[in-house]
Amino acid sequence: STIHTNNAAETITRILNMWVKAFLIPASVNAIIAQRLVKKLCSCKKEVNIKDIGEDIIKSVKNAINITDKQELSFRVWDKLKKPVFYKSVGCKKCDWSWYSWRTWIYEVLEITPWVKEMILSWSSAFNINRQAIKDWMISLEQDGVMKALNGLTSLEEIYRVAKSQKG
């Protein structure tokens, strides 16, 4: 089923607001996936000088990748964290000067862990459920997007254009 929310945790509060009894959610849901489509950079991309990226974006990136004890997050970008390189497109005939070609997706998977289950049963806020899910090793939309930007699939600007609505 599809429920339009900004992140996976908001799905729980949306269901609760539809007067579904709280005990039914963990009894019938194992995981919730939130996803967003992001534009992929064209092959005409070039490296961006870190100094040219806005300080607010750099701060957000540092916060997103600061949780380096996550095995999956570390495994996917560990070598790139030592000297991060981000890209932007310059435009060409192939992308019709739009800088992007096709799309890819960023996603997060919120598993209904025992801690999350307790929070659902006590009607915790989406913000607190999201925080707990991240403690329980969920990789957020923002973190997945930063990993894709570090791998040159998309730009930081695109990630923060799409993922900004899911913050706090």
Model-predicted regions and their roles:
Residues 1-168:
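Short, flexible helix-loop junctions that flank or precede catalytic/ligand sites
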